[in-house]
């Protein structure tokens, strides 16, 4: 038996190490996981009761249209309910658009490094992948425009970008959209939207009225703290959503996930508190890096990429053996550093202490 040609040699996604895995491997009792950009403060206190209220309905299929959640998200964004596409995490939304638009003979344009699932799903659909290197950690939109031709179907802009945390501002984005041909879909991945504090970050929902080919993706996995439940969504024109709906699997978001996301969306006070604490801790990371001569990309997310000027796997391993899980830049296309999720003050204190010790040992400061 043989799988499809495009799957041969295509590696599966490798998530960061789990807490239990590290405990067993290194005999540690306390682990800090700062590898997957999860919310260290959890989710809204209202989520648990919303989940408990659904436990008697586990034998019943979920609402495949996610009506209650759809209504809340539409009201929150000021869009029509028919402009929304829900997925089992925004990963599935990526998959749906690739399934709907890409095929052999087409191509897709993206930055590198960026969120890897754009490339992964494009390869599965046997489309050509055109990758444009970041410049100073940021999208090179001019170079991306030059890669577009008559066979281009999707351009991906991760904003803010993962793994660098940098962003495309409103002026840059508008200038880019004005030059993208009308036959090309532009997907803006805003997974970290809630964490952004930059004044010139684009508010993209109103742009849907100006650019018919625009898609915005957001998620409940990051700031809302519902990564385990897998709820993401796309926002686009009614006609575009209608066209791609057949590519969506039925019942793709669970009853529990829908209920949890709906109440989490209501608790914007929780989100504001998380964002405020995240920004304060990011500033502490900046000061730490500057005091120790470490390069970093200023971030509009809940993570920071730090360039140590050495093998990222070595930094990753040093921290791992001391109970701190981060992401090696080698796995992300930035081999001389690591990506660290911004944790609580106590977690970050331990990170600073451990990195300081490492730098003294290796005499990198």
From Swiss-Prot:
Single annotated GO MF? pyridoxal phosphate binding
Tell me the protein family, please: Belongs to the class-II pyridoxal-phosphate-dependent aminotransferase family. Histidinol-phosphate aminotransferase subfamily.
Please give the InterPro entries that the UniProt record associates with this protein: Aminotrans_II_pyridoxalP_BS (IPR001917), Aminotransferase_I/II_large (IPR004839), HisP_aminotrans (IPR005861), HistidinolP_aminotransfase (IPR050106), PyrdxlP-dep_Trfase (IPR015424), PyrdxlP-dep_Trfase_major (IPR015421), PyrdxlP-dep_Trfase_small (IPR015422)
Extract the Pfam families matched here. Answer: Aminotran_1_2
Keyword Transferase found = yes
What SUPFAM superfamilies does this protein map onto?
PLP-dependent transferases
Q: What class of enzyme is it?
A: transferase
Q: What is this protein called?
A: Histidinol-phosphate aminotransferase
Q: Which cofactor does it need?
A: pyridoxal 5'-phosphate
Pathways involved? Amino-acid biosynthesis; L-histidine biosynthesis; L-histidine from 5-phospho-alpha-D-ribose 1-diphosphate: step 7/9
GO biological processes: L-histidine biosynthetic process
Name the domain of life this protein comes from: Bacteria
N6-(pyridoxal phosphate)lysine PTM positions read: 222
Does the UniProt entry include the keyword Iron-sulfur?
no
Q: Which CDD domains match?
A: AAT_like (cd00609)
The reaction(s) catalysed by this protein are: L-histidinol phosphate + 2-oxoglutarate = 3-(imidazol-4-yl)-2-oxopropyl phosphate + L-glutamate
- Known partners and oligomeric status: Homodimer.
Q: Which Gene3D superfamilies match?
A: Aspartate Aminotransferase, domain 1, Type I PLP-dependent aspartate aminotransferase-like (Major domain)
Which keywords accompany this UniProt record? Amino-acid biosynthesis, Aminotransferase, Histidine biosynthesis, Pyridoxal phosphate, Transferase
EC annotation? 2.6.1.9
């Amino acid at each position: 038996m043989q799988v499809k040609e495009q799957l041969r040699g295509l590696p599966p996604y490798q998530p960061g190490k789990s807490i239990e895995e590290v405990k067993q491997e290194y005999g540690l009792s306390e682990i800090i996981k700062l590898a997957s950009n999860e919310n260290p403060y959890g989710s809204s206190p209202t989520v648990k009761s919303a989940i408990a209220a659904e436990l008697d309905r586990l034998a019943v299929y979920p609402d495949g249209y996610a009506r209650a959640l759809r209504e809340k998200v539409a009201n929150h964004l000021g869009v029509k309910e028919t402009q929304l596409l829900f997925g089992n995490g925004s990963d599935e939304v990526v998959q749906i658009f690739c399934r709907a638009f890409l095929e052999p003979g087409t191509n897709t344009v993206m930055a590198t490094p960026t969120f890897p699932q754009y490339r992964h799903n494009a390869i599965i659909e046997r489309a050509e992948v055109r990758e444009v290197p970041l410049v100073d950690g940021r999208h090179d939109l001019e170079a991306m425009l030059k890669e577009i031709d008559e066979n281009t179907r999707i351009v991906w802009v991760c904003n803010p970008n993962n793994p660098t945390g940098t962003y495309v501002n409103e002026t840059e984005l508008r200038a880019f959209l004005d030059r993208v041909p009308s036959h090309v879909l532009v997907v803006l991945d805003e997974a970290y939207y809630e964490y952004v504090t930059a004044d010139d970050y684009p508010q993209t929902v109103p742009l849907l009225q100006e650019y018919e080919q625009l898609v915005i993706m957001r998620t409940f996995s990051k700031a809302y703290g519902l990564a385990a439940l897998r709820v993401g969504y796309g926002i686009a024109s009614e006609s575009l959503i209608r066209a791609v709906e057949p590519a969506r699997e039925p019942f793709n978001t669970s009853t529990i996930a829908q209920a949890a996301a709906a109440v989490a969306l209501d608790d914007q006070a929780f989100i504001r508190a998380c964002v405020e604490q995240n920004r304060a801790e990011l500033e502490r990371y900046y000061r730490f890096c500057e005091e120790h001569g470490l390069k970093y990309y200023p971030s509009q997310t809940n993570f920071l990429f730090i360039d140590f000027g050495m093998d990222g796997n070595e930094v990753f391993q040093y921290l791992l053996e001391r109970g701190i899980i981060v992401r090696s830049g080698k796995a992300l296309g930035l081999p001389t550093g690591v990506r660290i999720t911004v944790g609580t003050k106590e977690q970050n204190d331990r990170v600073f202490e451990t990195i300081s010790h490492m730098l003294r040992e290796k005499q990198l400061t």
